[in-house]
């Protein structure tokens, strides 16, 4: 497992005790995950669904070779030295499945080498975990390497929320 959940689990009982003390009512699993990931724990209250906005601090972020370049360019404008949240970059969306894994990866590497080179370099420089083309689809990479019960992950891929159904 590339993400260490020990810190999360060490802090979880204290956070849950505070949530229970403030809300004083039974909570759904989703509420437990959301309330223990509030960016400002001191701003905790019983938020009104559909009315209140909340700021969350996920445990990790993830992106892929389609959504990632634009997010990274935005990050570069911030002039930050490192990313503030553990994050991963998976190169999978630019691989087209046509003739089989080996020939398709060769085509992807040849046609997308500039993008892959940029993402690898920036990932190393700013602290992203980098998964090159051929590592697997991002949904599975995130699920198998970063998912843990009670955790929260922000990902730029519309299918990745399926990880929530398996514990995160």
For every predicted segment, state its role:
Residues 3-168:
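Fe-S-dependent hydro-lyases/dehydratases of central metabolism
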């Amino acid at each position: 497992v590339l993400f260490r959940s020990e810190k999360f689990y060490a802090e979880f009982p204290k956070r849950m005790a505070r949530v229970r003390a403030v809300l004083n009512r039974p909570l759904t699993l989703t509420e437990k995950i959301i309330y223990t990931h509030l960016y400002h724990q001191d701003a905790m209250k019983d938020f009104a669904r559909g009315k209140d906005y909340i700021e969350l601090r996920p445990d990790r972020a993830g992106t892929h070779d389609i959504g990632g370049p634009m997010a990274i360019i935005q990050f570069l404008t911030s002039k930050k030295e490192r990313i503030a949240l553990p994050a991963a970059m998976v190169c999978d969306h630019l691989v087209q499945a046509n003739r089989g894994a080996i020939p398709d990866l060769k085509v992807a590497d040849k046609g997308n080498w500039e993008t892959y080179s940029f993402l690898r370099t920036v990932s190393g420089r700013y602290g992203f975990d980098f998964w090159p083309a051929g590592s697997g689809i991002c949904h599975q990479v995130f699920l198998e390497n970063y998912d843990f019960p009670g955790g929260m992950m922000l990902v730029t891929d519309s299918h990745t929320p399926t990880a929530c159904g398996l514990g995160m």
